[in-house]
Amino acid sequence: RQVLAFVQAHPGESGIVYCASRRKVEELARSLAAAGVRALPYHAGLEKSVRDANQDAFQQEDGVVMTATVAFGMGIDKPDVRFVCHADLPANVEAYYQEIGRAGRDGLPADTLTLYGLGDMQLRRLQIEQGDSSDERKRIERQRLGALLSLAEAPRCRRQT
């Protein structure tokens, strides 16, 4: 509901909604489309022809919302993206900055929304701790997660216009 409300606050505008899983990309694209939003899915599990067609529609048409995993975005240079929403916690601060940086490249205002909850943080911590990485790598990943959460919990936007 929060994603739908955010997208509906930008009628006729192009945007990207990032999801952590292919399943969520598909589900969100369907639910947004059912609400009248021109939403298209994009993830590595789709046929290349479908990915290409959806990417072309996003690049060439106004008002298209791409629901996508991080597989979407490299080489995308659409200047009038008005919003980026993370329906799940981004991978890290660097990925977050790269992904939100796809909005407002034309110099006009753009919005971002990042949704996450306690379950997201717990899952990420569990993934770090149960991973096969060295203790040093796990320490670094815990620091990166802490930095991401600090950014997400900051009381102000990174940059306001």
Where are the regions a protein language model picked out?
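Helicase motor core with emphasis on the C-terminal RecA-like subdomain
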Residues: 1-135, 140-143
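Cys/His-rich short segments
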Residues: 140-161
